[in-house]
Amino acid sequence: MVDPSKPPTKKEIDRINRIQRDHFNRLYHLFDPPLPAGVPGRLEKIVAAAAIETGDTVLDVGTGTGILIPIIRHYEPGCIYACDLSEEMLRRLKENYSGVKTIQKDVRELALPDESIDVVFINACYPNIADKAGALKNISRMLKPDGRMIISHPLGKAFIESLRQGAPYPLDDFPLKSETKKLLGPYGFAVKKFVDQPELYILAAVKRR
């Protein structure tokens, strides 16, 4: 796992983000349904881990074409923000789901108000985040006390390992259970749930009061 306290330079972060934006702008159509067998059920487990309550404000980081959005909506949140680097991903999301507030921006640069978010999902994109320290710091700022953050992947850690060699941008590992306290503690998070199965990864954390 890359040490989040030692992020790349701003120039390198911008370069990585530009490569990812262009990559997903070209390939956004590959993320359209139908999803692989078993994935819908695992996505439901990921969203359930956040314990969304009616009226909650939810932020979906690296939302892509919005695969979590219909599941999140089952819980009747008050507002959904969807953040992604790729304008084509967000365009497809807006075609499929009305009423979602889309933001094309790196999560570390999101300017939502302090303590305004109840739940943050980082699904299938944590390894892609170039500046994890900046991302976690900003997410902590935006989350309310007792707000929940879910880092997840519906295909598990091995899927990321299979992508790493061919990816045109760096892909980090998902944190091991033994690494979570060191990773998240400095940003005020306590881990509440950890699942590391061959085809499912869930790290659920709560922002301490």
Write out the residue ranges for each language-model feature:
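Class I SAM-dependent methyltransferase SAM/SAH-binding core
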Residues: 59, 65-109
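Core SAM-dependent methyltransferase catalytic element
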Residues: 187-188, 195-209
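A conserved beta-strand element that flanks and buttresses the S-adenosyl-L-methionine
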Residues: 121
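Conserved class I S-adenosyl-L-methionine
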Residues: 1-51, 67-71, 89-92, 150-174, ...
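Short catalytic micro-motifs in class I SAM-dependent methyltransferases
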Residues: 124-125
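A short glycine-rich, Lys/Arg-flanked "PGG" loop and its adjoining helix->strand segment in the class I
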Residues: 133-145
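Short alpha-helix
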Residues: 172-187
